Amino acid sequence: MKYIQAFMNNFLGNSPDWYKVTIGVFLVINPFIFWFHPFIAGWLLVAEFIFTLAMALKCYPLQPGGMLALEAVTIGMTSPEHVKAEILANFEVILLLMFMVAGIYFMKQLLLYAFTKLLLRIRSKLTLSLAFCLTAAFLSAFLDALTVIAVIISVAMGFYGVYHKVASGGTFNDPSDITNDAKIKQNMETLEQFRAFLRSLMMHAAVGTALGGVMTLVGEPQNLIIAEQAGWGFKEFFFRMSPVTLLTLISGVVTCITVERLRLCGYGEKLPRKVWGVLAKFDRAHEEQMTTQDRVKLGVQVFVGIWLIIGLAFHLASVGLIGLTVIILTTAYCGITDEHAIGRAFQESLPFLSLLVVFFSVVAVIIDQHLFAPVIELVLNASESVQLLLFYIFNGVLSAISDNVFVATVYINEAKNALTAGAISPYQFEMISVAINTGTNLPSVATPNGQAAFLFLLTSSISPLIRLSYGRMVYMALPYTIVLSIVGLLAVEYVLPGMTQWLAQVGLIESPHIPMTSVFGH
């Protein structure tokens, strides 16, 4: 009995007992359900994995989700070879997480300096929210959304750390455990207000990455896949999407203003005066203590930042490799040569990278068990008059459950097969391509598992500090989800066809412009 108790204490560590039992039940019943009905077992596994993400603040999803994925491979729901194929297919994302996030860590001195100035000068919360949302949207149109979120997380961690040290009775330079609130007594209410303030900024920025990412060829990984199948370059892709994306960008800005003014769904909390005072004092102290060497370091980081933007905007190398150059340049010219100091930069990204590989295992199960097959068949067999609506709706729903890159890849391949077989016209294929791209990018803000950037935010070290749980992310994203989904749907149905014809008439796009090449597999 003593050993059983010890085993249960070790199993999933400090997680609640009910959570441990729930995961144990999942592991016991899954093989039996798979033996009885593989299709049901596949959907159950997806639901269980989403449950582990929803409980991320109770237990990091890597361990429970990893055990579920490991069991799925063991009982034959998918194969190790297929999991490896999914990992290789997403190798660019893996490189990005390994190196780019670590690279941003070494630029946090510049980021904290710049954003502290921004925060202190813009006193209006509404203006600040719009600044975060639109800046994230602009950057995500040219950079990767994960990179943008990594920057925002680094900034938020810096702000939180500065105030937490002072609220705990320390000074700016004191070492402090920012996860421990035990020393905070009088300032607890202010800290909660500051957490709400940071939560709202983080969510505005996260949604901003989706608003900007959908607009351009390089904004999201699935955009490249869709553009390759349709034969669109950077300019044509932008104009093809513009009838939908410009409307959703405007509606996103209006939503940002509305939720802040009406204080809806957890938005509207202003920066507490006490916190502003602490940050202002920190900024003054930082300026006074800054040596010539420190200013040179900031200058180096500015030049590396310029290289980062140019490298990503012009695709001079893969995102991950550009991230590696950022690590090399910042550490070399800022004098960071200690192995342990370099190693700390990877602490944020590697747990999430491991979780993402587990997620690819679940995607492999979805493919092998044909979980989306009935939906795909339904959409492709529908009449042309409702096809665009169905493509948009089902891409949106499935992207909120699964990974939007995977959903977009499956649907664009099926649509290309239908085109090759003569089931749909070239013009209809082009309309469908826009519906797939906007459908996977916009409604997927509904849940953290829809977009890798959202999932990264949920599982980052800032989320437990500011109490940003899965449920709270869904709740705070709700106004954006409703508005973007509806506006996107109406734009696809009523604005897209007419605007596409007008854009073709004025020579901004070519129609149809589709290379009749063989369809690649996923």
UniProtKB/Swiss-Prot annotation:
**A single GO molecular function term of this UniProt record:** sodium:proton antiporter activity
- Annotated membrane topology: Multi-pass membrane protein
Q: Which reaction does it catalyse?
A: 2 Na(+)(in) + 3 H(+)(out) = 2 Na(+)(out) + 3 H(+)(in)
Q: Which UniProt keywords apply?
A: Antiport, Cell inner membrane, Cell membrane, Ion transport, Membrane, Sodium, Sodium transport, Transmembrane, Transmembrane helix, Transport
Where does this one sit in the cell?
Cell inner membrane
**Do the record's keywords include Iron?**
no
User: According to its record, what are the GO cellular component terms?
Assistant: plasma membrane
Q: Which Pfam families match?
A: NhaB
Q: Report if keyword rRNA-binding is assigned.
A: no
User: Its principal location?
Assistant: membrane
Which pairs of Cys residues are joined through disulfide bonds in the record?
A: none
Membrane-spanning segments: 25-45, 49-69, 87-107, 128-162, 201-221, 237-257, 302-322, 356-376, 388-408, 446-466, 476-496
* Annotated family: Belongs to the NhaB Na(+)/H(+) (TC 2.A.34) antiporter family.
What is the purpose of this protein?
A: Na(+)/H(+) antiporter that extrudes sodium in exchange for external protons.
Can you say what this protein is called? Na(+)/H(+) antiporter NhaB
Q: Which organism is it from?
A: Actinobacillus succinogenes (strain ATCC 55618 / DSM 22257 / CCUG 43843 / 130Z)
